[in-house]
């Protein structure tokens, strides 16, 4: 079965569970399968939630909540960091979009 069909089947199953009022725990298996499908295609998805943030990070684009400080942490992730494995190297294909706040 093609990757696209597998993804669409998982999305459809998630939609059915949400429409039936199922809780988030019942959807966890579908999310694991979706991530696994993309990992099998060479993508690495990283959630930087609660990591330390500094302006020198090249894998995140941040919006600051409150006033900037010397020590900041990631408090919300709108988009994850995504890498793709290509011929024994990792290539950043998407920077995370995050919200940061003073520690």
Regions found by a protein language model. Name each.
Residues 1-21, 29, 36-103:
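Extended, amphipathic alpha-helical stalk segments that mediate dimerization
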């Amino acid at each position: 079965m093609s990757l696209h069909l597998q993804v669409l089947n998982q999305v459809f199953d998630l939609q059915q569970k949400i429409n039936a009022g199922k809780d988030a725990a019942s959807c966890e298996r579908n999310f694991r399968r979706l991530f696994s499908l993309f990992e099998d295609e060479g993508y690495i998805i990283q959630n930087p939630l609660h990591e330390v943030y500094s302006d020198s990070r090249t894998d995140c684009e941040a919006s600051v909540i409150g006033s900037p400080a010397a020590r900041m942490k990631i408090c919300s992730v709108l988009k994850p960091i995504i890498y793709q494995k290509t011929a024994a190297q990792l290539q950043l294909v998407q920077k995370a979009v995050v919200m940061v706040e003073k520690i």
